[in-house]
Amino acid sequence: MAFDSLSEKLQNIFKNLRGKGRLSEADVKAALKEVKLALLEADVNFKVVKQFIKSVEERAIGQDVMSSLTPGQMVIKIVNEEMVSLMGSETTEIALKPGSEITVIMMAGLQGAGKTTTTAKLAGKFKAKGRKPLLVACDVYRPAAIEQLTINGNKQGVEVFSMGTNQKPVDIAKAAIAHAKNNDFNTVILDTAGRLHVDEDMMNELIEIKANVSVDQTILVVDSMTGQDAVNVASSFNEKVGIDGVILTKLDGDTRGGAALSIKAVTGKPILYVGMGEKLSDLEQFYPDRMASRILGMGDVLTLIEKAEAQIDADKAKEMEAKIKKAEFDFDDFLEYTGQIRNMGGIGSIMSMLPGMGLGGNMKNIQMPDEDEAEANLKRTEAIIHSCLLYTSDA
């Protein structure tokens, strides 16, 4: 996951702080100098880092901290609180109109950011909440994008409105909203065209759609792997088109993660969701406090619980528990169990949410298998079980 390198560096810095019985002003300043370097290496915006360190230092170098019985923990607590504040303090929901009123959401972003896939993921989120979403293919320049949206929409059980590549995006948007009104859809999501870079034609097209269609929310999808470029892209879109929030994709990859720590501070716009994988279910609501906790190696147990609740049926869990107690746990139960683990993101994803088990924590001392190898072994085991003949005592 992104932040693994940053997390490891920060935890090593704080480990040294915790080892000191008392802290001097020089100790705090030396530690914060290392924190500053770690944040810059993670590609966090320089101005953001400078203000962050200043805020932490003002709070950390004080009588309450220095005279505390656990000054190291107090400094870590301050860093955690300032990091949460940096990323937005509280979770921001996408504002949706109540009942049958139609909410129009325009998705924007550069090519390769994962905008079309994210659009389908978002539609699935809304459907799960009881909304009736309509996906609209407004990318008339890339036929593959229309096909991709249609395929993913079908997988999510969401209707996709398309008029091919010979219509203007603004006309498609208008027709889609009329279709939504006539067919009781209450959430219209416009998948607009991406470009290889920010250009005037792209911006003007988005501005035209906003001017002619009552867009309620404009959401920008940015690739977290592009680091500071993601922040620059967000700033450009916000200045020229106006955005209401950001979705960060590919945060599960080997990225430095600086964009997540910079976007809110630079643009003033919240991060709404983060993409944590390629599956259509791999879209997580962004919680600043939970993300800060992950970065500092404190885990994210709440998200783990939510994933478990979403994937594991309570009655089946009790039934499985009873089987284990009676020594009746069989291969069918094992297959069901492994399926639930996979749906939660796999063993690596689960372990990363446990306190101290990120790469910067205790996990580095544990021999963990390669995720691809572990997945292959799991599939092999499942295939062996599926190939077994059912044995009965009457055979």
Short names for language-model regions:
Residues 197, 217-329:
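Conserved phosphate-handling catalytic cores of large alpha/beta enzymes
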Residues 204-223:
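Inter-motif core of Ras-like GTPase G domains
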Residues 377-390:
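C-terminal accessory/binding modules appended to enzymatic or scaffolding proteins
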Residues 145-146, 197-203, 230-231:
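Conserved ATPase-coupling elements of RecA-like P-loop NTPase cores
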Residues 357-379:
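Small-residue-rich helix-loop
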Residues 6-138, 145-165, 172-182, 186-192:
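Primarily NTPase-proximal linker/entry elements flanking Walker-type ATP/GTP-binding cores
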Residues 391-395:
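Conserved small/polar residues in nucleotide/adenosyl-binding loops
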